[in-house]
């Protein structure tokens, strides 16, 4: 897999969300996490939602706690939000936003809902299975084809405005399998580190 820590996000925030992302992303990167999304909403008063993950795509409660403790003081100093807010740190979840090229590679074969900023084959919204990914675009096999449409569509990464995995049984199975493999790899790494210390 490519070095995802250096890989830019394809879909980024605007306005105050962008300012918050600029403040916290270096902190997350320094801790070995990737920023997925920042969203400030009026939910439950005012809520600042930060989605992040490890480079291997996993995230646990302890990771969320560590991130919260690291970014809270930075946000307090920079003070980008004028009102009081609740900080909520979470994983992207199984039906996650797709924000990096590696997300499309990692989840190839799964259903995704996509919106573009420009017309692609006379549409801005697509739904289908990711069947191919290259440096500049990805190919979707549409799950619903309108009259006169091709069964596949190539969507350029630079046209993306939103993309999200669609929850299916296959996605749940593969996400759980990937999480289990990542945890096993981390445990093996810890065992090797402990053996080196002896």
Swiss-Prot record:
UniProt xrefs under InterPro entries: Ribosome_maturation_RimP, RimP_C, RimP_C_sf, RimP_N, RimP_N_sf
Keyword Cytoplasm: yes
Keyword 4Fe-4S: no
Alphabetized Pfam families for the sequence: DUF150_C, RimP_N
Gene Ontology cellular component terms for the protein in this record: cytosol
Intracellular or extracellular location(s): Cytoplasm
Single GO biological process annotation from the record: ribosomal small subunit assembly
Primary localisation category: cytoplasm
Keywords of this entry: Cytoplasm, Ribosome biogenesis
Top-level taxon of origin: Bacteria
Family: Belongs to the RimP family.
Stored PANTHER family: RIBOSOME MATURATION FACTOR RIMP
Function of the protein: Required for maturation of 30S ribosomal subunits.
UniProt name for this protein: Ribosome maturation factor RimP
Organism this protein belongs to: Agrobacterium fabrum (strain C58 / ATCC 33970) (Agrobacterium tumefaciens (strain C58))
Designated gene of the protein: rimP
